Structures are given as structure tokens and as C-alpha cells.
């Protein structure tokens, strides 16, 4: 199959129509209704295997373990998480709910890491009882709570420490996490991170296993990863000088994807070369650790498409508006981050036109793209919004009392419904009316 769209290996235009994994997108829209999320099983497999292939050198050259811990925040649909678990993928969870899904997905406990800057006691209990690989500790108060909770349970909790390296990830400020001004991590320069680890070593119910770092999301430049890796390994050397040995280095996630189809960005191989080459420079100073990464977007984003049907077209003095039945409640990224997503008409026409694509919500920010060149759009056409497999359905909501959409999985075994559309009854299922209003 010829790759027609950068980053999207399993789609093509055939006989004037858009196909995903060999399935006609227009027919999928007709069968399952719109708006509709379509996830490509084959693309997820391709993306995961690119990580494994790129980082196999780590295990070959160091004899240490390499773990991909999928960031469930990107898309925690149970079919997606089970697919990745079957491939051998671990889990990066940030809530009790995500841990619950990871266990339902049969992810081995020793491949689960628990992130987040405000873990509750209930979540810590869940993690300890699940015997997860590590809590990535974000504060001294959290460390104290983990130790106290483990004591109450009569167990020992494995902990790694999330450090803040003050690295500029060169990404959108709302998804930057590794600068001093960000809320995440323990500061290294001031000595807080070292203090926390030394405190942990004096505690009876925690076991220090590693160092963690995550500097941001949608990084399209390798240099911040190199700086992050260097600063983490410098800290590992400092720990060694204090007589502290660690088993795991977790460098988080963040590798970007090509939302713009005319812009090449770093690959998993580029990331692997940068990280491995940097870490190996320290092999004479410290024993090489197990290596953990937490990709989310780069595993599932390019596997997802949001199909929306055109219901109305409106000409204004400024633009030609195309109104589709998908909205910002279904996919928040353009409204929240002013994010770009490639959009096409699923039916190829002989004529092009410039249009703006919007949803039907009562918000001026409910716009998927402005002044885009598409094949001529008519009422009834189906548009495909690309690269929505991450932070699409996971950020969907019920604004304007709209139900979240269906999701299907395309695979070599067929097309499977993996999330049902919410009904009007679902919208009020958790509401309770007091007796005096009945």
C-alpha cells in the first residue's frame, strides 16, 4: 500500500474514496452512524513495534530491560488497552480508574507505573495491592502518605522519584511539564529531589527503585530529549556518589506525531538513538539501569479518525462554513489547544474549494479547521479528521447535552464496535432529583 499521508500507514484513496485498513470510510459512517471514531488495529501494532525495534539495541548492549508503558490518558478504551497488553505493552496510569482498566487489560503488575501529582490514599492502596512496579513520587508529602499507607497494609511499596529537570520541551505551554514553573516533579538543583530520596531510604515501608522524568508532550525536536536524558543521568551519578543505586530510569513520553502531513518529524528510531547514545556515555560511571518509556500519542494518535457527516453549508462574507455532526465535545484538541488536524472529504471530487469546518455546538471555538482546501463539499458528504486516536475520545464530554460517539476498531479480522454511542438516557443516568421536585 502506498503511504499517502505522513504517519498514517494503513489508509489509502481507492476508486475515489477513503479507506481505513481496507474498509470504505463512507460505508463505515453509513453502517455505524456519525460522528464515529475509527481506530486502526494495524496502525497501533505498527507504532508499538517501531518502539520495540528501535530500542532493542538497549537490551542487546546493556542486558537490561526495556519497557513501553503506554500512557492510558491518551486513550483508555478497553479494546485498545487489551490490544496493547497482548502485544506486551505495559501501562502508565494516573488514576485509580486507569489502574482498574490496566488490571482488566491483563497488564502484568511489574509493567505498571503510577504517575500523577495528587494521588489519593485510595489510589495508593489500589497500587500497593496490585503490586505495581512503582509509584512515581511527585512530592515529599506523597512519599510520606505512601509509606504510612504501606505500613497500614503491612506491605512494601516500590517508589521512583519524578524529578523536574527544568528542560524546555519546545511544545505548547499547556502540555509542557518539565520546566521549573510546571507543577510536576521534585526540583534537582535545590536539593529537594535528593532530600526526598534520602528520606525514603530511612523509611521502613517503601523501596526505592528508580528515577522518573517527563518533560512534555508532542515534542518534534530531539534535543530536549537529549537534555532530559543527560540531566537524569547526571542525577543518577549524584545518587551513586551518595551510595544510592537505582534499578530503573523512566524517561516518560512525549514523542510527537506528524499532524501536518507535509512536515517530517523525528521517529522512534531517532528517539532511541538519542536516548541510548546519551545513556551509554555514563556506562563507566554507573551501572546501566532498566529503561522505561511512557508513550501515548505516538502509539495511538495516528491510528484514529473521526468521521463526521455534513449537514449544512453556509456562505458568509468571510468564509464558507461546512457544518458537521462531530463537535468539540467529541474532540477537544482544536478548541483547547488550537491544534491542527488534517481533514479530508472521504469522496474525491474533480473540484477543490476552500472551506472552514465546524461542529454544531454553541461555542465559537467549535471549529476543526479554518480555510482548508478540500475536495468540493456537499451536504451528505463524510469528512475524516485525522490523528484523533490520542486525546480524542479520552477528552470527550457531554457539553450541550450531546452523547459521546461510537468507536469501532478496524482489523484484519473485521470491524468491531468497541464503544457504544451514549443515549439521551445515559446523559441523565447519574442525575438525582430530590423528592420535592418530583
Swiss-Prot record:
Keywords: Amino-acid biosynthesis, Decarboxylase, Lyase, Lysine biosynthesis, Pyridoxal phosphate. Pathway: Amino-acid biosynthesis; L-lysine biosynthesis via DAP pathway; L-lysine from DL-2,6-diaminopimelate: step 1/1. InterPro entries: Ala_racemase/Decarboxylase_C, DAP_deCOOHase_LysA, De-COase2_C, De-COase2_CS, De-COase2_N, De-COase2_pyr-phos_BS, Orn/DAP/Arg_de-COase, PLP-binding_barrel. Competitively inhibited by the substrate analog azelaic acid in vitro but not in vivo. GO terms for molecular function: diaminopimelate decarboxylase activity; pyridoxal phosphate binding. It comes from the Archaea. This is Diaminopimelate decarboxylase.
